[in-house]
């Protein structure tokens, strides 16, 4: 009795059914068990057994019914409700009532496919009439010659009801829509996606030949298969190619049959084997002999899409220096491509005020070009002025050279006259020759000083010299004075050749002479003075620039009447001429 009550209390707890499986799941079994327990425990009477059986029977339907199952109990143990699970997960429906009812098959004659809402378009259906070899030839022609892909070529063939000739003839009439993405397009899309994200309008700026719909379509197909790092993906593919070439067992890396861990282990093993082989083949001497090449390879900057603060500063300075010359700016930054620089400019033009920087660059460039255009006429004018100035100076130098040549010629002629005259004189005049030579030497010195002064004055005033040379030819006054006395008084011949010069030239001539004389007297006292001082015999005659007057032409004539007539030598001529051609005076000395 006690055991039966305990069992009933375990089954029913405060009016709730136990979570665990009930020991009295079946009624008959429960009654039998309880009866046996009670019978074994107490044999006093049948009334207690009846009450126990009633209690047991009343508790059994609540504890466990035939409708409940272990699945329901397991569901509640897991904390899941029936509403969250479909009825097909709870029980297996088997029987006629749970099968789908198929409609009867409609004959082909009664079918109306145009009345159906959802219809598929058949683009290809294989046939046995065309052999595989001809079909492959047709597809290759469509690909290589007309740019079709395999599906488009087969669709054209099916459109013409498997007629190869008509399909080949019709291939040229249609241009297939190229929706293929090349490797360059894919790389550009990845870079643009890293910069702009899902802003397809900005991505289209880097891929102008693609439409927005094509970009969106490719994005969703690329999103499913892309990896976190495309650079690592390319490196992994390169390693796979190396491993496949160097693997001895020929097994493919990363097969679907192996797990991820086995795949990684196999990759690492094969990479290690390949590296071991490379290490064995490396020659240490060659590596040591070429350290510079290794350094240059390692020193090459790595292209990165991420902009560091230093790179931003360099880019701003380069934009200020080169404007919108993006290739040059990319070379300056050295870690960015032209596309990176262009994108940086577009994204940060407001943040860093890049438009204003470019305007300043263009304004400075225009100013430089304008300055160059202005300097070119100035240089031409300066060159023309130099050429014009060189012409008078050349004329002055030419006139000075001609005047010097005239002076030299007249000096030589006078010297020749002196030599002939000295030969005609008696031999008793030989002791006086050194004095005559000294006088001639000083005349040459005076001529040299005159020439220097003339060149200096013409150089200092080039324009005045040019005007003077244009208005008047180079003038030269030649005065030949012949001292004719008796044999006791030595006759000396002083030849003075002066050129028409400015006051500077005349002052220079006067400074070279120690004792200039305006008149020549024939007294014996002056002759003796000339013998004692030969320089006094040199007459400095300066011709003025405006008048061209002769210096004391009448006064310079020697009064020869003092000497006796018997002692005078044959008559000699004294010629005085000016270079201007205005007057030529000849004097006859008796």
UniProtKB/Swiss-Prot annotation:
UniProt modified residues of type Phosphothreonine: 25, 65, 375, 411
Compositionally biased intervals (Polar residues): 21-37, 411-423
Any coiled-coil regions, as ranges: 256-283
Protein's cellular compartments: Nucleus
GO molecular function: chromatin binding; transcription corepressor activity
Entry-linked Pfam families: ELM2, Myb_DNA-binding
Residue ranges constituting the SANT domain according to the UniProt record: 176-227, 302-353
Subunit comment: Component of a complex that contains at least HDAC1/Rpd3, CoRest and Su(var)3-3/Hdm. Interacts with neuronal repressor ttk/Ttk88.
Family: Belongs to the CoREST family.
Protein name: REST corepressor
Native source organism of the sequence: Drosophila melanogaster
């Amino acid at each position: 009795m006690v055991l039966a009550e305990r069992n009933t209390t375990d089954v029913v707890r405060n009016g709730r059914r136990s979570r665990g499986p009930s020991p009295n799941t079946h009624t008959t079994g429960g009654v039998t068990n309880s009866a046996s327990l009670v019978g074994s425990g107490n044999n006093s009477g049948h009334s207690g057994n009846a009450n126990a059986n009633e209690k047991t029977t009343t508790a059994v339907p609540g504890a466990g019914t035939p409708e409940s199952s272990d699945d329901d109990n397991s569901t509640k143990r897991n904390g899941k409700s029936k509403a969250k699970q479909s009825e097909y997960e709870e029980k297996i429906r088997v029987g006629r009532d749970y099968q789908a009812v198929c409609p009867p098959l409609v004959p082909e004659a009664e079918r109306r496919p145009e009345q159906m809402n959802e219809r598929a378009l058949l683009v290809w259906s294989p046939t046995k009439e065309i052999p595989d070899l001809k079909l492959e030839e047709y597809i290759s022609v469509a690909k290589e010659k007309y740019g079709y892909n395999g599906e488009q070529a087969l669709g054209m063939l099916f459109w013409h009801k498997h007629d190869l000739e008509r399909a080949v003839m019709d291939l040229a009439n249609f241009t297939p829509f190229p929706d293929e993405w090349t490797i360059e397009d894919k790389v550009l899309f990845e870079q643009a996606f890293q910069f702009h994200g899902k802003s397809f309008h900005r991505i289209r700026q880097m891929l102008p030949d693609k439409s927005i719909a094509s970009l969106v379509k490719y994005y969703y197909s690329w999103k499913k298969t892309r990896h976190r790092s495309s650079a690592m993906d390319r490196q992994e593919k390169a390693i796979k190619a190396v491993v496949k070439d160097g693997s001895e067992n020929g097994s493919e890396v990363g097969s679907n049959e192996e797990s991820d861990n086995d795949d990684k282990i196999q990759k690492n093993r094969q990479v290690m084997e390949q590296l071991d082989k490379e290490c064995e083949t490396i020659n240490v001497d060659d590596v040591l002999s070429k350290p510079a090449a290794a350094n240059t390879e390692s020193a090459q900057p790595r292209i990165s899409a991420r902009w560091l603060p230093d790179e931003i500063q360099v880019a701003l300075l380069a934009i200020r220096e080169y404007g919108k010359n993006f290739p040059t700016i990319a070379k300056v930054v050295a870690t960015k491509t032209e596309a990176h620089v262009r994108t940086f400019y577009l994204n940060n033009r407001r943040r860093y005020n890049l438009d204003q920087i470019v305007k300043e660059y263009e304004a400075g460039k225009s100013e430089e070009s304008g300055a160059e255009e202005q300097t070119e006429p100035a240089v031409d004018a300066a060159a023309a002025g130099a050429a014009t100035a060189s012409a008078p100076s050349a004329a002055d130098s030419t006139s000075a050279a001609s005047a010097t040549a005239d002076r030299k010629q007249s000096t030589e002629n006078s010297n020749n006259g002196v030599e002939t005259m000295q030969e005609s004189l008696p031999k008793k005049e030989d002791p006086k020759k050194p004095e005559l030579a000294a006088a001639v030497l000083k005349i040459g010195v005076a001529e040299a000083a005159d020439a220097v002064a003339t060149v200096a004055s013409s150089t200092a005033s080039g324009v005045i010299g040019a005007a003077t040379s244009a208005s008047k030819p180079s003038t030269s006054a030649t005065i030949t004075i012949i001292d004719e006395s008796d044999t006791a008084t030595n006759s000396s011949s002083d030849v003075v050749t002066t050129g028409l010069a400015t006051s500077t030239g005349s002052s220079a001539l006067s400074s070279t002479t120690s004792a200039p004389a305006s008149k020549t007297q024939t007294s014996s006292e002056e002759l003796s003075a000339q013998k004692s001082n030969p320089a006094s015999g040199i007459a400095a005659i300066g011709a003025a620039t405006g008048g061209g007057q002769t210096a004391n032409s009448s006064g310079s004539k020697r009064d020869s009447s003092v000497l006796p007539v018997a002692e005078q030598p044959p008559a000699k001529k004294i010629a005085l001429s000016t270079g201007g051609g205005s007057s030529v005076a000849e004097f006859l000395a008796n």
